[in-house]
């Protein structure tokens, strides 16, 4: 057998589309997506601890509210008090509020977050999507419209079409995350994302291939137009996520 080409692998051993990746600090500024520390914590104390531990490794913090026990029962005053505390703790980092689950509860939480959080993550299939986007704009809060496929990798055409569809709904940032069952599928979603960014007046995008076979997409996303790449604290919030400290080294 011939010698393995080490230049085409990262420390985890997976190939990066035939390119040797530059160290993160050596890459051009416009090629480096911001790292979002995605936190799925069962209680507020743990959430605050994770922010303190990893805030030097990220530019954005995402609170996955549905993972916090009792979050469905928050009153508006309780939620805004907690969110304000978290926002202060982030100290200049952008804050995303995300809620996956019951749409009615999620929309209520997201409305309360407007004006405090910098960005709210709204599912592309939300029945009140346009209404939520308009309300967020009135309250000067950016919207990230997200679309997830957890069991397959759609075709490039499907992905590109979905980006355009989300753009028409008025989101400020468009995110698509799909599961990769083989490494080559990471290339599919990144190429589709890159094609979308060639369009005039395109919106900022995030493209992620979930799963272990999609990990390369989390490192080189910026080369294909993504403005954000997601990482975790002590516990992954999606398949294939890197720890924020590890990802920040690229």
PLM regions: where:
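Short beta-strand/loop segments at the ligand-binding rim of alpha/beta enzyme cores
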Residues: 31-37, 90-100, 139-149, 201-206
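Well-ordered, non-membrane alpha-helical segments in soluble/globular domains
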Residues: 73-84, 104-108, 159-160, 186, ...
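Short amphipathic alpha-helical segments and helix-helix/interface helices
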Residues: 51, 80-87, 109-114, 129-134, ...
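Conserved N-terminal beta1-alpha1 strand-loop-helix module at the mouth
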Residues: 11-95, 102-103
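N-terminal acidic, proline/glycine-rich, low-complexity intrinsically disordered segments
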Residues: 1-6
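Catalytic alpha/beta core domains of metabolic enzymes, predominantly
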Residues: 126-250
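Catalytic beta/alpha-barrel core
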Residues: 40, 60-71, 96-102, 117-129, ...
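Short, acidic/polar
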Residues: 42-54, 104-111, 155-165
């Amino acid at each position: 057998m011939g010698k393995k080409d080490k230049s085409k692998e990262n420390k985890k051993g997976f190939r990066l589309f035939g390119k040797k990746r530059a160290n993160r600090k050596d890459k051009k500024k416009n090629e480096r997506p911001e790292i979002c520390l995605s936190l799925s914590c069962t209680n507020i104390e743990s959430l605050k601890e994770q922010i303190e531990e990893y805030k030097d490794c990220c530019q954005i913090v995402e609170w996955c509210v549905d993972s916090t026990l009792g979050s469905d029962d928050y009153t508006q005053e309780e939620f805004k008090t907690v969110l304000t505390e978290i926002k202060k703790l982030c100290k200049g980092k952008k804050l995303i509020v995300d809620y996956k689950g019951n749409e009615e509860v999620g929309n209520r939480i997201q409305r309360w977050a407007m004006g405090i959080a910098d960005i709210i993550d709204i599912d592309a299939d939300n029945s009140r999507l346009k209404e939520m986007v308009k309300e967020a704009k009135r309250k000067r809060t950016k919207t990230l419209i997200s679309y997830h496929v957890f069991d397959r990798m759609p075709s490039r055409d499907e992905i590109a079409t979905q980006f355009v569809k989300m753009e028409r709904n008025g989101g400020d940032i468009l995110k698509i995350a799909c599961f990769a069952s083989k490494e080559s599928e990471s290339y599919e979603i990144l190429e589709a994302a890159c094609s979308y960014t060639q369009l005039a007046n395109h919106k900022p995008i995030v493209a992620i291939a979930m799963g272990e076979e999609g990990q390369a997409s989390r490192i080189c996303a910026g080369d294909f137009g993504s403005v954000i790449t997601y990482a975790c604290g002590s516990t992954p919030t999606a398949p294939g996520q890197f720890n924020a400290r590890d990802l920040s080294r690229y």
